[in-house]
Amino acid sequence: MARIAGINIPDHKHAVIALTAIYGIGKTRSQAILAEVGIAEDVKISELNDEQIDILRDGVAKYTVEGDLRREVSMNIKRLMDLGCYRGLRHRRSLPLRGQRTKTNARTRKGPRKPIKK
C-alpha cells in the first residue's frame, strides 16, 4: 500500500478513486491532481512505480488535506461559537444551522428523543 498524506491508499483501486480515501480530496480534485502530475486516471495504484508515487505525493501536498483540514474546520466552528453569532449558537445547541424546521424533524442533528419528566 502506498502512503500519501499519512493515509494508506488502497492498491487495488484506480488512482482517481484511491485518492478519495484522503480527507479533503473528492473525485474532482483527484482528477485535477492526476492531470497536473501527468498520471492517467485509470491506472491502478499498484501499477505505479516509486517515482510516480513521489510525484503524486507532491501533488497532494499542495492542498490542505487530512489533519490540517480537520483542524481548520474545527477552528472555524469554534470561532463561530466564540463570536456568539447565530450559527455559533446553533452549533452550541446542536441544532440545524441553515434554516431547516426543527418542530418535527432534525432528529439526526438533535439526537434521540429525551422523555419529558413529570
UniProtKB/Swiss-Prot annotation:
The keyword Amino-acid biosynthesis does not apply. InterPro entries: Rbsml_uS13_C, Ribosomal_uS13, Ribosomal_uS13-like_H2TH, Ribosomal_uS13_bac-type, Ribosomal_uS13_CS. This is Small ribosomal subunit protein uS13. GO terms for molecular function: rRNA binding; structural constituent of ribosome; tRNA binding. Belongs to the universal ribosomal protein uS13 family. Residues 94-118 are annotated as: Disordered. It comes from Aliivibrio fischeri (strain ATCC 700601 / ES114). It holds the Pfam family Ribosomal_S13.
